[in-house]
UniProtKB/Swiss-Prot annotation:
Stretches with biased composition (Polar residues): 48-60
Entry similarity comment: Belongs to the SlyX family.
Domain of life: Bacteria
Protein name: Protein SlyX homolog
Species this protein is from: Cupriavidus pinatubonensis (strain JMP 134 / LMG 1197)
Region forming the signal peptide: none
Gene3D superfamilies: 1.20.5.300
Disordered: annotated segments: 48-67
Length: 67
């Protein structure tokens, strides 16, 4: 009976450690997601605030020099 109890306590300790590690990993990933979303919003604002500039700089709309 004592051996089984010790084995269960050891397994529980490992599971608690694993759970803590996984919680830290999830928290870190959430921080990374938040940062990526913030960067995406900033990039989206840049792209949508100047749509005419992108169209004007498109080389397909330029007349070749020999015309």
């Amino acid at each position: 009976m004592d051996d089984r109890l010790n084995e269960l306590e050891i397994k529980l300790a490992f599971q608690e450690d694993l759970l803590e590690t996984l919680n830290l990993t999830v928290a870190r990933q959430q921080q990374q997601l938040d940062l990526l979303q913030e960067q995406f919003r900033a990039l989206y604002q840049q792209v949508t605030s100047a749509p005419s500039t992108a169209a004007e700089s498109n080389p397909q709309h330029e007349i070749p020099p020999h015309y």
